[in-house]
Swiss-Prot record:
This is Membrane protein insertase YidC. Interacts with the Sec translocase complex via SecD. Specifically interacts with transmembrane segments of nascent integral membrane proteins during membrane integration. Required for the insertion and/or proper folding and/or complex formation of integral membrane proteins into the membrane. Involved in integration of membrane proteins that insert both dependently and independently of the Sec translocase complex, as well as at least some lipoproteins. Aids folding of multispanning membrane proteins. The keyword Transit peptide does not apply. It comes from Trichlorobacter lovleyi (strain ATCC BAA-1151 / DSM 17278 / SZ).
Length: 530
């Protein structure tokens, strides 16, 4: 093995460490404001204080205490809405638990918002609608069976002569929730402004664990994913106002998003609130409502898992929230392959092993070429050493002589490295797919590995992986000097410590890959044997 091979391996380790912190370049938001028409309805020639026209149903304030909580239950979740701001206080996912221990609590999203500004609270921009306005719901609770659709309508009647209705439409089967916000102008003067929906969440991650390593705000704007950790807005507000498709608060596995419907998001402003929360203010396009008219703005909510098929079904490019990095074009097929094999074997660990075997077979020609090149280079070592001794005082002459030696023996000096480099994007893509796949969350493999998204609790697989790396090195023919040998002997130790805290699913991939490589190397050594 040559010095350049050692350098390639060492650089790969460095890139591997840094890669998990890279999420692709972020576009700078354009400063231009967005002006998009919204749906305006003519109430008719009724008196300014009335909403009796046929196009708008009469305002009937339900006989329920204002600001009361309303519970909505479907087969997927239990949501608690508040009359304060007609907001969503929390949503508990029935199919997901905080840990994989028996009796663990179900995952509850949005519950850590600022109590004064629950998620999806709505305020007026340009007119006096408070985010703490007390709305009256049309029902005290809702329960939906699979396939059913039902509505929750919150109504707020303002003393200044306008009415705001927020209508949530639920699907008993999915995670998506339709939202329509309507302003009815019963006053004698036009009302100009916009609606603004508020997301608030703790500025610091609720917990210091792997789930929150990508915690923060994200949005899809102008065809690009933009992610902002809380620290990005700790000292200054950040605003996006061009081509926004959706805006969200997310962590590694779950997403709470507001989706645009017919360009209904004009801008998103991120900041640290006065109360110390991460705040996302999502504004609609500006509107003007004449007396006797109404305006309705539509959005869609998604609060659920970052599972690629579920996200894709929502539309609006929501699947882009699953950020698989620079090599997502490779990582997404890897993820789909993982899901495909799982359907047949029922175990994600086995699915990882199958993918590893397929990749090893696919890259066999490149690996064969790499090892063959290294073997041929090894044969030239004595002649190269002689040339170095002969031209030790003339580096230019030595380099020319070495290149001539390569040409005479038809050896490519990069032949051992290039096949390795070609495989690096595939490894990083699979790394991303395994690291950020919710499918592996709490997925058992066998024996003591009960969660492929968590580290091996007894560190057995990382240690075995280190041993297989050592065996690999011993099987690789080399003409290294003493210093190079020490460097190479240190690599299994470095990798072992690196992988102690890595998800066991990723360690499993690397371990199986090493075992297959040992067998492959033994076979190739036999093929290229003198």
């Amino acid at each position: 093995m040559e010095k350049r091979t050692i350098l390639a391996v060492v650089l790969s380790i460095g890139v591997f460490y840094l890669f998990s912190f890279f999420y692709g370049p972020e576009k700078k938001p354009a400063p231009a404001a967005v002006s998009v028409p919204v749906k305006t309805e003519n109430v008719g020639a009724a008196p300014a204080v009335s909403v009796q026209a046929a196009a708008i149903a009469p305002v009937v304030v339900p006989k329920i205490v204002s600001a009361a909580d309303v519970t909505v239950e479907t087969e997927r979740y239990t949501a608690v809405f508040s009359g304060v701001g007609a907001s969503l206080k929390s949503l508990t996912l029935k199919g997901f638990r905080e840990t994989n221990k028996p009796g663990a609590a179900q995952v509850k999203l949005l519950a850590n918002a600022d109590p004064a500004l629950p998620s999806f609270s709505t305020r007026g921009v340009g007119f006096a609608l408070s985010a703490q306005a007390a709305y009256s719901p049309n029902v005290s609770s809702l329960k939906l069976l699979s396939g059913e659709k039902k509505q929750l309508v919150f109504t707020y009647v303002d003393a200044q002569g306008f009415v705001v209705r927020k209508t949530y439409t639920f699907d008993g089967t999915g995670y998506g929730i339709a939202l329509e916000t309507q302003l009815v102008n019963n006053s004698a003067a036009p009302i100009a402004g916009a609606f603004q929906y508020l997301f608030t969440s703790p500025f610091d991650p609720p917990q210091k664990d792997g789930r929150y390593e990508t915690y923060g705000s994200s949005l899809y704007a102008d065809g690009s994913l933009h992610t902002d950790a809380p620290k990005n807005v700790a000292s200054a507000t950040k605003k996006y106002d061009k081509g926004i498709t959706w805006a969200a608060i997310n962590d590694k596995y779950f997403l709470s998003a507001l989706l645009s419907v017919n360009n209904s998001i004009a801008s998103v402003e991120l900041k640290k609130s006065a109360a110390g929360y991460l705040e996302s203010d999502i504004s609609t396009p500006a509107f003007s409502v004449a007396p006797g008219q109404a305006v309705t703005v539509a959005h869609k909510l998604f609060i659920g898992p970052k599972e690629i098929d579920i996200l894709k079904a929502q539309g609006s490019s929501l699947e882009q929230s699953l950020d698989l990095g620079w090599f997502s074009a490779i990582a997404k097929p890897m993820l789909y392959s993982l899901k495909f094999f799982y359907r047949y074997v029922g175990n994600y660990g086995i699915a990882i092993i199958i993918i590893t075997v397929i990749l090893k077979i696919f890259f066999f020609p490149l690996t064969h070429k790499s090892y063959k090149s290294m073997k041929e280079m090894g044969k030239l070592q004595p002649k190269m050493a002689a040339l170095k001794e002969k031209y030790k005082n003339d580096k230019d002459a030595m380099n020319r002589a070495v290149m001539e030696l390569y040409r005479d023996h038809k050896v490519n000096p990069l032949g051992g490295c290039l096949p390795m480099i070609v495989q690096i994007p595939v490894f990083f893509a699979l790394y991303k797919a395994l690291m950020y796949s919710i499918e592996l969350r709490h997925a058992p493999f066998m024996f003591w590995i009960t969660d492929l998204s968590d580290k091996d609790p007894f560190y057995v697989t990382p240690v075995i992986m280190g041993v297989t790396m050592f065996i690999q090195q011993k099987m690789t023919p080399s003409n290294m000097d003493e210093m190079q040998q020490k460097i190479m002997l240190g690599l299994p130790v470095i990798f072992t410590f690196m992988f102690l805290s890595f998800p066991s699913g990723l360690v499993l991939y690397w371990l199986i890959n090493n075992i297959l490589t040992i067998g492959q190397q033994a076979y190739i050594n036999k093929l290229v044997k003198d």
